[in-house]
Amino acid sequence: MAKKNIHPQWYEEAKFYCNGEIVKIIGSTRMEINADIWSGNHPFYIGTQKIVDTEGRIDKFIRKYNLNSENSESL
């Protein structure tokens, strides 16, 4: 037999807040959900993401260990 009264209460009209504004009305086990960032204002999802990595990992490795074409041939 299934146990009674073990599941959390489900709220059909829970309010989802982002930066103090109601963004969505969703179903949740909490009455209110607060978030700093969500898909509606995240740079990746709205297309304003900038690539931060300006140099490649291989170039960084070579520079870090002072490897150049002359040194790599002797290895």
Curated annotation (Swiss-Prot):
Keywords for the protein's UniProt record, in alphabetical order: Chloroplast, Plastid, Ribonucleoprotein, Ribosomal protein, RNA-binding, rRNA-binding
Any one GO CC term of the record: chloroplast
InterPro entries per UniProt: Ribosomal_bL28/bL31-like_sf, Ribosomal_bL31, Ribosomal_bL31_A, Ribosomal_bL31_sf
Pfam name, any one: Ribosomal_L31
The keyword Ribonucleoprotein belongs to this UniProt entry's keyword annotation: yes
Described function: Binds the 23S rRNA.
PANTHER family, alphabetized: 50S RIBOSOMAL PROTEIN L31, CHLOROPLASTIC (PTHR33280), LARGE RIBOSOMAL SUBUNIT PROTEIN BL31C (PTHR33280:SF1)
Stated family: Belongs to the bacterial ribosomal protein bL31 family. Type A subfamily.
Protein name per Swiss-Prot or TrEMBL: Large ribosomal subunit protein bL31c
Organism: Cyanidium caldarium
Lineage: Eukaryota, Rhodophyta, Bangiophyceae, Cyanidiales, Cyanidiaceae
